[in-house]
Amino acid sequence: MTAVTDPITRPASGEMSLARPAGVLHDLTAIAGRALRAVPRDPAAVMPPVFIALFFFIVNIATLKRLTGNHPGFSYTAFEMATAILLGVTGVSRAPALVLDVQSHYLDRLLLTPVRRTAILVGHMAADVAVAAVLTAPILVLGVILGVRFHGGVLGVAAFILLAALWSLAFAGFGYAIALKTGNPAAVNSAFLLFFPFLFLTSSYVPRSQLAGWLSTVAGFNPVTYLLGGLRSLVLGSGWQWGQLGQALAAIAIVGVISMTMCFAALRGRVKRGAQ
């Protein structure tokens, strides 16, 4: 009696394995790379904030600089550059693109894959940090042309860009929360409106010492006040103002904790609804 055995199929010589590369780093790189590749194809998502920031930077200097021209050692151009930077990077994120992924059901298909759920958001946010850092360049170049100097040299410039990018990341969480919760492009695009009270109820255009009454009180509770203080400490005064930089980082952290809690909760809700 002859025994019959099933032949073992072995991969042909030179045949490549199609197994999915494992690891959270691969997931993050794939998501962030896709988000970054989409940026040049969607300039309308990133260019308007920069143009608006440059416009108000120039206009505010032209109209308000002479009011502080008699104060020696004070540069209103340097003072106002921090406000322009926040206008340029706040609300800039790939959240509108994520809404399109929701509407096209690409996100639902992505959730069926082994990709880590947190990598979906973190990958997009990594791309946001890179984009925000690049968007600071036109404003910084204009500021330097107009006479702004960083007391910390190259390190001061790097710290300025880092603070701006971290703030952009912290605020972007609100956009992602709205995108995942509603799947509505109009709602996501209106997320920037959340920033306006923070921008105007603070020392955006005059030093905090010049604010009076209830506005001064509100500014004391506004995280943007401390962020502006940290940014301005790099271009006004002398040396590293560690206290102000620490307050700026703390303000970013508070906003970031709130926004990230909201957006990751929205992601869990989206995953749960997709599983039903």
Predicted regions and their residues:
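Junction motif at the cytosolic side of a transmembrane helix
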Residues: 2-13, 235-239, 250-276
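Short, membrane-interfacial amphipathic segments enriched in basic
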Residues: 10-32, 171, 214-225
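Membrane-interface helix starts
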Residues: 33-52, 240-242, 246
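Membrane-interfacial helix-loop-helix junctions in multi-pass membrane proteins
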Residues: 38, 151, 202-258
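Transmembrane helix-loop junction
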Residues: 38, 61, 65-66, 100, ...
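Hydrophobic alpha-helical transmembrane segments of multi-pass membrane transport proteins
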Residues: 55, 59-60, 75-146, 175-178, ...
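Transmembrane helix segments
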Residues: 60-62, 179-221, 225
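Alpha-helical transmembrane segments and their short interhelical loops
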Residues: 117-192, 241-264
